[in-house]
Amino acid sequence: MTPPVPPGGDAAGPRQLRPVEVKRLNREWRRVSGARLALLLDSVGQPFNVGSIVRSAAAFGAEHLWLCGGTAPLSHPGVAKTALGTQRLVQATVEASPVAAAKAAAAAGLRVVAIELASGAVPLHEAPLDGDVCLALGNEDHGCSAALLAVADVVAYIPQPGRVGSLNVAVAAAVAMAEARRRAWTR
């Protein structure tokens, strides 16, 4: 199955879509995105990162967000500023620990895939992202906690051939969500 494509341009070439066309396209994408997607944030402390992740989660149709550890709360002004109101589109639950959050995700029928540069991790493009998944991301400086890595079903990393060792957590979340959705659309 391939994702819906935007309507074609005219003789003048491509053009930006009108709002009604964007809404129609979004409805089609939701229809073909059968797999459930959720996120678990383990001590993501910077409010602007949390807000960016929430906005991306809403854009990719994530249905749930588990916040744990020292993750900035959705009520923080910095989160609200970056999320631009999208926090109302994603259900959120605060859990005491990443292990409790991972167990809640598993109980909801989600495979927990931690996104981390760790020994034994598989490249994201080889990770089992088919079906219902919860992508777990960790702290900006320390990544996912050892406790979270121990309970995750899979640990995956984003291959980065450049000279930088890691991505910003909000960027990594968006890359992982895009790959999960791409996988759902191409099976």
Question: What is each PLM-predicted segment?
Answer:
Residues 1-187:
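Post-transcriptional modification and biogenesis factors for structured RNAs
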